[in-house]
Amino acid sequence: MFKHILIPTDGSRTAAKAIKAGIQLAKEMGARVTGFYAQEPLPLHIHGEGYIADKELVAEFEKRAAEYAAKCVAEVSDAAKAAGVPFEGVVLKSQSPHKAIIDAAKQQKCDAIFIASHGHKGLTGLVLGSVTQKVLVNSEIPVLVFR
């Protein structure tokens, strides 16, 4: 049914469970997987208009953000490799993670998105996390929500 599944992660425990389930689904379907992380750009209050930021502070933030993004994508990579599922990793900088997830799915030509019900921000919106809700509402391809 699905040949290419995007599995976004934010590094949360719920996302880790979704990664395992998404990889298992991909394996059973003979699909490949793209692991995805939406890296938030430098917060405006650190380098915003009219504010001169310390270059070392900015560099340290960027370094740590990139390391965390790589760690998150590596979690998907490790699970895919262990299951023998073809894998590709993608990181995009975005202030709108839901848009980045949808854009990544389009760019990578995925035919489904397998996403955790909620991430680091908890149970926003009662049942689904706000990012997951926005992906569900705006995606043009099937979205499978793991809870």
What are these language model-derived features?
Residues 131, 139-140:
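Short, structured coil segments at secondary-structure junctions
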Residues 18, 45-48, 99-102, 125-127:
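Short, well-ordered secondary-structure micro-motifs
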Residues 112-134:
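Glycine-rich, Arg-bearing micro-motifs that act as flexible, cationic patches
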Residues 3-55, 79-88:
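Small/aliphatic-rich secondary-structure junction motif
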Residues 75-113:
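Structural beta-alpha unit
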Residues 50-54, 105-108, 131-132:
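Short, hinge-like loop/turn segments at secondary-structure boundaries
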Residues 55-71:
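A short acidic, glycine-rich active-site loop
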Residues 143-147:
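Short hydrophobic/aromatic patches at helix-to-coil boundaries
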